[in-house]
């Protein structure tokens, strides 16, 4: 597997692919889809600013429709899924051109399609659980395409109205996982036990996600079918590629 970091404006991708010919394809995908989003925002500024689901025009680009659908499912604005959706489109386009193994991580939001199992390491800021837990995405899920997305109220620059160290959502589509992580994270308010319960209750209301893992400090909770949890360490979580994943 070839490792590559790609940075274009606000988009910072950690990419793993099985052939370097897919690197330029990924760059072109980022440029094209960013332009599609930006041009749509010029005509419909509310697409950028809305914190609630919005309808998009019938002739909107595919990525805009995907983001709007994810926002509708998770009850958030479309931009809540932008990072995961860009990763999803990078993987989708590479697979259409014959790529067998690809992992795209965009600010903690991962889309992947691989022939082997993948361990996604947990990073939850200052929580003692950071770097100690990984989630093993088995071959069946990985080979069909999968999304693992993380939202945090204590790490990074993304908007969250909650205080969770990590909301990790697992779903077939990274776009839905990303929007759902944001939506669930907004409920992480108050004492850890109460906040985690509120997050898990919200997660139960969202369709099309497999499960969620919530971290607040030393406390954690889960809902649904999350991948097998495995012990890991900083060496594995911080691979030579990036901070979040590695194939096994």
Swiss-Prot record:
It comes from the Archaea. InterPro entries: ApbE-like_sf (IPR003374), MA1715-like (IPR037456), UPF0280 (IPR007183). Belongs to the UPF0280 family. This is UPF0280 protein Maeo_0343.
């Amino acid at each position: 597997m070839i490792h590559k970091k790609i940075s274009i404006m606000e988009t910072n991708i950690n990419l793993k692919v099985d052939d370097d010919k897919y690197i330029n394809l990924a760059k072109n995908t980022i440029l094209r889809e960013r332009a599609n989003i930006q041009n749509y925002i010029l005509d419909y500024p509310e697409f950028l600013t809305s914190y609630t689901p919005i309808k998009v025009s019938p002739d909107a680009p595919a990525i805009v429709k995907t983001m709007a659908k994810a926002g509708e499912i998770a009850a958030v604005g479309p931009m809540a899924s932008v990072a995961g959706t860009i990763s999803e489109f990078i993987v989708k386009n590479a697979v259409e051109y014959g790529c067998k193994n690809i992992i795209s991580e965009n600010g903690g939001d991962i889309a992947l399609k691989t022939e082997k199992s993948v361990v996604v390491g947990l990073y939850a800021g200052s929580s003692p659980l950071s770097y100690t837990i990984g989630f093993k995405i088995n071959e069946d899920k990985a080979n069909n395409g999968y999304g693992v997305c993380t939202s945090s109220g204590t790490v990074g620059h993304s908007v969250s109205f909650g205080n969770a160290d990590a909301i990790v959502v697992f779903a077939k589509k990274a776009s839905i996982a990303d929007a759902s992580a944001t939506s669930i994270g907004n409920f992480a308010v108050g004492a850890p036990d109460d906040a985690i319960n509120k997050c898990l209750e919200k997660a139960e209301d969202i369709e099309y996600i497999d499960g969620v893992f919530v971290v607040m400090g030393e406390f954690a909770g889960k809902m649904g079918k999350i991948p097998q949890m495995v012990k890991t360490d900083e060496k594995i979580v911080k691979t030579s590629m990036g901070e979040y994943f590695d194939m096994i």
